[in-house]
């Protein structure tokens, strides 16, 4: 069940990233370039997690798991920061912008779900000579 939730969150991240990239590409004169970078971040985060869950990165074993752990940890911090900042911005300004709130929420939720998946499936256990150290 958790695997399915992580997969759905990853697909949502890819879709959200593509929407932000397309928004910047079609209206680049009026949309700040940070929208492109946030969209690329969401797309990369979602795509890497999908590849990991499908087993396409199995040949990299612990390196792929470590990269997923590091990337999702960083995404959780950035997503939480973006979510908090966008909520504070919306509270202090009359114009409510929901896109930054949704982008931060997408990034944070997918990161937390992926980290929980790694923890629950016991993939973060240290290894010595190819075997579990614990």
Description of each model-found segment:
Residues 47-80:
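Loop-to-transmembrane helix junctions at the membrane interface
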Residues 1-44:
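N-terminal signal-anchor transmembrane alpha-helix
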Residues 3, 89-133:
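Alpha-helical membrane-associated segments of multi-pass integral membrane proteins
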Residues 8-16, 70-78, 106-113:
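Alpha-helical transmembrane segments of multi-pass integral membrane proteins
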Residues 1-4, 26-29, 56-66, 91-101:
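Juxtamembrane loop-transmembrane helix junctions in multi-pass integral membrane proteins
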Residues 32-46, 69-72, 97-110:
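Alpha-helical transmembrane segments of polytopic membrane proteins
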Residues 27-34, 77-105:
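Interfacial non-cytosolic loop connecting adjacent transmembrane helices
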